[in-house]
Amino acid sequence: MQNTEDGSQALKHLQHPRFARAYARAVGRMNRRGATEHRRRALAGLHGKVIEIGAGDGSAFVLYPLTVTHVLALEPDDYLRSLAVKRAATAAVPVTVRAAAAERIPADDGSADAVVASLVLCSVADQAAVLAEIRRVLRPGGILAYYEHVRSERPVLGAVEDLLTPAWQRLAGGCHPNRDTLGAITDAGFTIQDNQRFGFAVQSLTPSVAHILGHAIR
């Protein structure tokens, strides 16, 4: 497996050391509660060259099907990327880890068969810009595989998420709990192939939060 850590001064504003360490500790619990199977469903059927944005600690690397020939995994946070590099070494498919943000994907136009966004579109500063960049690197007919938490359709819970968002994004690495990510994907020109909406509690004592999982075609 090829791994690179070419850090950049341009990524300094995307460093969240405390949140990154807290997130890395929480991922194991999330995975045991069902996040692993959610990611597995999102990755099923992918093939060829794949770009994963916001790869985090690399938990998804072992889940890629063998039909994938290469994964370019992008993670701007130094700490999470260091964990991803270690996981890339034991992945079932070739994985290259790069220091890069989703706003500027280091890939040519139309070079990817699929792009994976897993619990990352909640935290990017500009969803529309990131989705436009994803469209740029996808070939015509390429797939965006997504697994994201989104704003609740329940009026009271949705209002609470709206209220919490300004403080939460400062504490949680830019995360917005109130985004309409499915709407943003369709507004960006993608065609939804399949979509599942479900509640998922990341820990036993936390409330169930709305999630979406599916695939969209460029």
Predicted ranges, named:
Residues 103-115:
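A short acidic, Gly/Pro-enriched loop at the edge of an enzyme's catalytic core
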Residues 196-218:
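Core SAM-dependent methyltransferase catalytic element
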Residues 51-104:
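Class I SAM-dependent methyltransferase SAM/SAH-binding core
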Residues 113-126:
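A short SAM/SAH-binding and catalytic strip from SAM-dependent methyltransferases
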Residues 173-189:
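Short alpha-helix
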Residues 128-143:
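A short glycine-rich, Lys/Arg-flanked "PGG" loop and its adjoining helix->strand segment in the class I
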Residues 26-49, 59-63:
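Conserved alpha-helix/loop element of class I SAM-dependent methyltransferases that forms part
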